[in-house]
A protein has these predicted regions:
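Phosphate-binding glycine-rich loop
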Residues: 37-84, 95-102, 107-110
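Generic structural signal for small/hydrophobic residues in well-ordered secondary structure
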Residues: 29, 51, 69, 85, ...
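Conserved SAM-binding loop
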Residues: 69, 91, 119
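Glycine-/small-residue-rich active-site loops that bind phosphorylated ligands and cofactors
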Residues: 21, 39, 91, 114-115, ...
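Active-site phosphate-binding strand-loop segment of PLP-dependent enzymes
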Residues: 112-181
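N-terminal "arm"/small-domain region of PLP-dependent enzymes with the aminotransferase-like
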Residues: 1-37, 42
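Nucleotide-sugar donor-binding loop of glycosyltransferases
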Residues: 83, 89-91, 110, 160, ...
């Protein structure tokens, strides 16, 4: 979305977030592009290994986008056309696309106006017999209220794209797909 700046008549983006990339990141991307391997190759293997080591997991798999990651996770959870998937109304369109890709019915829920995370009270009102999952992004690095969401007894898919490396507390649960703010 753009707004018009009447002072000097230039279009300006509404501030949301800006990338913070430095020369080191630019050089790394340039090296990958010049290698001829932008989808696979040594850089991707190194990234996957470093990511897995950083978070103490056996494997990490790089995919082409957040949409692809969510799509694969929903498939792994067995979500399909017979399901509804609850997700926050204020979120990147990748969630909605992933839900559509598996044929499930998207069900938007309200957000907490202070954290921009999904509102557990509103989620509870939207649960039906067809609810197969709740997608829970941790917005702007703020952890969503998983304690309350877990009590709803619906499988949860955490979207940690905005909270990589964040800490909440370690949970070992069979009804969660994803990890603790990885």
């Amino acid at each position: 979305m753009v707004i018009s700046n009447t002072t000097n008549s230039i279009a300006t983006f509404i501030p949301h977030s800006r990338p913070t990339l430095g020369d080191e990141e630019v050089r790394a991307v340039e090296a990958v592009i010049k290698s001829g391997y932008i989808a696979e190759g040594e850089a991707v293997k190194q990234f996957e290994q470093a990511f897995a080591e950083k978070f103490g997991v056996e494997q990490a798999v790089a995919v082409s986008s957040g949409t692809a990651a969510l799509h694969l996770a929903l498939l792994a959870m067995g979500i399909g056309p017979e399901h509804e998937v609850i997700f926050p109304s204020f979120v990147c369109s990748a969630l909605l696309h992933a839900v559509h890709y598996v044929g499930a019915q998207p069900v938007p829920a309200e957000i907490d106006p202070l954290t921009y995370n999904i509102d557990p009270d509103d989620v509870q009102k939207r649960i039906t017999a067809r609810t197969g999952a709740i997608i829970v992004p941790h917005m702007f690095g703020l952890a969503a209220d998983l304690d309350r969401l877990l009590k709803l007894d619906v499988p949860i898919l955490e979207d940690c794209a905005q909270a990589v490396g964040g800490k909440r507390r370690l949970l070992q649960r069979d009804d969660m797909f994803g990890s603790d703010l990885l």
